[in-house]
Amino acid sequence: MLTKIPLAALLLLAASPLCAQNGWFQPSLLAKPEVHKALQSVDDRASDIVEEWIRLVETPAPSGKEQARAKYIRAEMEKLGLSEIRTDDIFNVSGVRKGTGGGPTVVFAAHMDTVFPEGTDLKVKREGDILRGPGIGDDTSNLMATLEMFRALDRGGVKTGGDLIFLASVQEEVGLLGARHWLETSGYRPDMFVAIDISSTEVWYGALRIDQFKFFYTSPGAHTLESRGAPSPAKAVAKAINALYEIPLPPIAEGFGSFKLPTINVGMLGGGTVANAIPREAWFTVDLRSLDSATQDRLESAVVSTARRIGEQEGVGFRLERKMGIDYSKALPQKERLHHPLVQTALATSNYFRKPGTPEIAAKDAGANDSNIAVSMAIPAVAVGAVLEHMPHRLEEYAEASSMVPGIKSLIALAVALTSH
């Protein structure tokens, strides 16, 4: 049975000066013989890790079709001797590395899916330290790092007080569906949740408001020869998309790096069956992202009313489907999340192992990954990264191979600190 550590006790620890600075991490932890051995083993396997990383990248895993990767990860969990290994009905794979007892239970989650459809050329190209290929970073690099972290703990003979759960999730890229399903149905209620799903230059402890919609316009249709002046769903889609991008947005929030928030994005559109007819139906999707609920609610109202108005103007039918929305009404208050020892520990370990010459990492009250679901359930959560990755969600995506080893070491330090304090 998984141990639940009272939140009040965790927050009391967070109030101490030592915890406020480094959370539960102290560099002396790395000098323990078993931890040192685990860290050294990562150095010894550096080239093999990169080769396996490349093989994982070249294994297709579009959202909803992660079965090949799931099979591989499950087999590796079995080799590790994890307990309670499960592949659920949507192909999330999880396993538990049992602790000695008395410590918190912590989930380390990396998602298996990528945004790239079947048929994408996934061949990885090497250019010195640079690895180029779709999915090389998001999130295959972190999946590889998490797997290797669990292996290294075993190689070092590291014992943790609490249980460590390895969750390889699915469908993160299409609404965090895998993490939601696992947290709602697995029967586990972890004390803390760590998503390994960003670049190693970041630590996120919050959750963006993310809402996704699919808008449909419909009509009876008509042959091209009868189309002049007739209501057209295609025309409505074109006008609606243009109108949505004309909606005034608040100033870009500062302090979030490349994030330009709030934002409206049309990511998909389609409709029709032949070239020589008005389509009976045409559709497009909208992804809204904001830092706060008030801004998001105003954007949602503006987007929905604009899309509906265009339908009325064009004389076509209109309907919408909400594809994603997360209720954060139960989330812990911002200050409690920021000052939780989990966040401070993640900051300390990430900064300890960060690339020399790079800026100090600061925690951001944001998030667009599996940790969002944990945040919404009042589970202390954070998102970290293991690798320096660049241009995610693009065919030109690339990552720095040499960043993998220190990234894995950072995860080892984080896992031991969180479960053995």
Report each predicted region and the residues it spans.
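A non-catalytic alpha/beta surface segment that caps or lines the substrate-entry region
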Residues: 50-104, 123
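His/Asp/Glu-rich mid-to-C-terminal helical/loop segments that flank catalytic regions of hydrolases
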Residues: 22, 235-239, 243-246, 294, ...
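N-terminal hydrophobic or amphipathic helices/low-complexity stretches enriched
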Residues: 20-62, 207-209
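Acidic/histidine-rich catalytic neighborhood of metal-dependent amide-processing enzymes
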Residues: 130, 135, 139-216, 256-257, ...
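Active-site-adjacent substrate-binding region
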Residues: 234-274, 319-321, 328-386
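Acidic-enriched catalytic cores of C-N bond-cleaving enzymes acting on peptides and small amides
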Residues: 22-26, 30, 227-269, 277, ...
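Catalytic-core environment of secreted peptidases
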Residues: 96-141, 194
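Zn-dependent metallopeptidase/amidohydrolase metal-coordination segment
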Residues: 25-30, 269, 356-418
